[in-house]
A protein has these predicted regions:
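Hydrophobic anchor at the beta1->P-loop junction of P-loop NTPases
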Residues: 8
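ATP-dependent small-molecule kinase phosphotransfer cores
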Residues: 36-119, 128-130
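ATP-binding Walker
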Residues: 14
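P-loop (Walker A) phosphate-binding loop of NTP-binding proteins
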Residues: 11
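Single conserved hydrophobic/aromatic residue that forms the stacking wall/gate
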Residues: 138-146
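Post-Walker A helix-loop "phosphate-sensing" segment adjacent to the P-loop in P-loop NTPases
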Residues: 26-32
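Walker A/P-loop
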Residues: 17
């Protein structure tokens, strides 16, 4: 596996997150949920933080922790995971992800999740754009399409 990175690309609600957690647990790798990272970005933008400061804010004030139920997100030690899972945050993330500035800012952050012990990254363009040298898995929402 090149660079010890496994990426799982696919559309929303195709099982990427569950597959990524299971593979990461099995291999002992770190995990990156890029959709959650986009939600954090949208959440911070909605809190009034400008694009130019969001990456720095994420690096300084946001902590990602894995547990049995998935990834927990802390902002200055306050759990904001439930806020990030709200439909309104998902819609905001979808809108903001269409902006080139957002995608460019997040690409460096996403690449920063790499760990020498390995990484499983899930998202719509993880293997095609963010980690092009990774082992790529593609999921489909329909078992027939896989």
């Amino acid at each position: 596996m090149k660079d010890n990175i496994v990426t799982i690309d696919g559309p929303s609600a195709s099982g990427k997150g569950t597959l990524a957690r299971n593979i990461a647990k099995y291999l002992g790798f770190e995990i990156l949920d890029s959709g959650l990272l986009y939600r954090v970005y949208a959440y911070l933008y909605d809190c009034g933080i400008e694009h130019a400061q969001i990456t720095e804010t994420i690096n300084q004030d946001i902590t990602f922790k894995s547990d049995e139920s998935g990834i927990v997100v802390l902002k200055e030690k306050n759990n904001i995971t439930d806020e990030l899972r709200k439909e309104s945050t998902a819609k905001a993330a979808s809108k903001i992800s269409a902006l080139l500035e957002t995608r460019e800012n997040l690409m460096l952050l996403q690449r920063g999740f790499y760990s020498p012990k390995g990484l499983v990254a899930d998202g719509r363009d993880m293997g095609t754009v963010v980690f092009p040298n990774a082992c790529l898995l593609y999921t489909s929402p329909s078992p027939r399409d896989s």
